[in-house]
Structure formats: C-alpha cells, structure tokens
Amino acid sequence: MTATIDNLTSRERATVLADALPWLQRYRDKIVVVKYGGNAMVDEELKAAFAADMVFLRTVGVRPVVVHGGGPQISQMLQRLGIEGEFKGGFRVTSPEVLEIVRMVLFGQVGRDLVGLINSHGPYAVGTSGEDAGLFRAEKRLVEIDGELTDIGQVGNITAVNASSLMGIIDAGRIPVVSTIAPGDDGSVYNINADTAAGALAAALSAERLLILTNVEGLYTDWPNKDSLVSVIGAERLREKLSALGSGMIPKMESCVDAVIHGVSAAHVIDGRVAHSVLLELLTSGGVGTMVVPDTEMTNGTVYRKDNHV
C-alpha cells in the first residue's frame, strides 16, 4: 500500500484527501473506539501505521479511544515461562498464575509499546487499564462449550463502565490506550476479552463507531469462499448467526451486536493485516471490512456501502 501511495501524483493525492472530506466532517468531535489486535500488534510496519492512524484521526478532530488485547504476546510469554496456554470457546483459560502474566504483558508491554509509538508523533497517548479510576467492574464469565456452561478461571464479563474516568483524558485532547483487566465486587481480578471490553466501552461512551481489528477481511457466510464476505449486516440478523461462527469470531461479532443495540451508530470488523485499515474503513465509501448496523437502517435503505448486504 505504501508503494501505491508513493506512486500517486500530487493531483491524485489531493483528490484522495478531498474525497475524505464528508467523512472527516461526519466524525469530527465524535468518539471512535478501536480494538487493536491481530497482526497489527506484532508486525512492526503495521504497528507504526496503526499509531499514525490514531494520530491522524486526533489531528483532524476525531476523538479515538484504543482498547488493546495482547494474545500473541501473552502466548509468547507463557511459552517462555513453560506454562501451557489453553483456549475454550474463544476465550483464554486464565488461572491465577496466568492472570499475573496477562496483567504484566497487557499493561507493562503491549500498552506501553503502543503509547510509545503514538507519542513518537507528539504527546497524545495516555496508558490506563480497567483497574484505574474504577473504569471497569466485572464478574466471572462462564463460557458455553458443547452446550454446557464452563468455568475457565479468572475470565470476566464487564458489569459496569465508569465512562467519566476516561472523559477527562479525551476532553484534554489525549488518546486513551486501555488494557482490559478489571476488578470484581468479589475481590477478584478478571481478564476481560478485549473485543468484549471495546464494545462495552463504546456503548458507555456513546461512541459514533466501534472498530475491531482482526486477521481476516471480515465476516464470511460461506468460508473459505471469498465471494461470501459480508459488507453490511443488521445487528439482529447477525445475532441469529452467532452460534454458527468460529469460536474466535464469536466475541468480535457479539461485541459489535451489543454495541449497536446499545446505541453505537455502527460497528466494524476490519482486516488489521492491511496498513491504515482504520482510515480506509472510516474515510472511504467502500471500506475494507464488515459493518454492523441497526436493522432499521437495512430496511429503510439508509445504508450506502458496497453491495453485499445480509
């Protein structure tokens, strides 16, 4: 993509910027929550591109909030320490020992690295976690596996979000970078799936958009048939399809559904392997992923994007 941009003439670059104007106007002063994950977290060029996207959005008046996972880094650290990692139903099995490593990697490594990349462009990013200033409260989450609810350790569901604890950072013109660890009323600390946390935070902040980066192009109705990629889908229609999705995709799509049902204008699952995918999704008519919208927008014809609707 960089090579393509470098080959554009000055006139062509000006056209690209002009085409983005309606979208820049739409999102100005609006909160956009972005879940940072997938290859965008491990490839150095993609990491730098993501950080630049966040600074670009902030510079043009959008108010980005980043929620990050740390799956690859957590798995790598567990392997280095000789601890076996396990997933059930798309969620990491989290013993007290694993939780301490998750906590250390999320806030001490992934979050700090991203804050540093963003701040290489100026003093924009502030690292925080769900434990700070009462941002998140959580309770134990039981995961349904083969029709049975299963305890997978210190994995939690968010029960409350104190949005005001972030608004001070946002109103100061900063970019919050949020690690997804949350305390519970029972005195325990829980590992929160970052997709789930991003959706809950987007709803609590009355965000205009939720974007979730992943390692696929979006939602497929007939994987691996690439022609079955869905561009736009109604939230309730997607809810009906959740049980048929792969385990790794369920938390992402569940988060999108919940966010839209609770007032977020639209949620997007986009390909984090594409440099500047956030800008492509937000600031172009075509976008690069799957957009989840209220079902009323599917029925009254107000969705104008691509041609593969479900």
Curated annotation (Swiss-Prot):
GO terms for cellular component: cytoplasm. It catalyses: N-acetyl-L-glutamate + ATP = N-acetyl-L-glutamyl 5-phosphate + ADP. GO terms for biological process: arginine biosynthetic process via ornithine; L-arginine biosynthetic process. Substrate binds at residues 70-71, 92, 191. InterPro entries: AceGlu_kinase-like_sf (IPR036393), AcgluKinase_fam (IPR004662), ArgB (IPR037528), Asp/Glu/Uridylate_kinase (IPR001048), NAGK-C (IPR041727). It is an enzyme of class 2 (transferase). It is found in: Cytoplasm. Its EC number is 2.7.2.8. Its main location: cytoplasm. GO terms for molecular function: acetylglutamate kinase activity; ATP binding. Pathway: Amino-acid biosynthesis; L-arginine biosynthesis; N(2)-acetyl-L-ornithine from L-glutamate: step 2/4. Keywords: Amino-acid biosynthesis, Arginine biosynthesis, ATP-binding, Cytoplasm, Kinase, Nucleotide-binding, Transferase. Pfam families: AA_kinase. The record marks 35, 252 as: Transition state stabilizer. Catalyzes the ATP-dependent phosphorylation of N-acetyl-L-glutamate. Belongs to the acetylglutamate kinase family. ArgB subfamily. This is Acetylglutamate kinase. It comes from Corynebacterium diphtheriae (strain ATCC 700971 / NCTC 13129 / Biotype gravis).
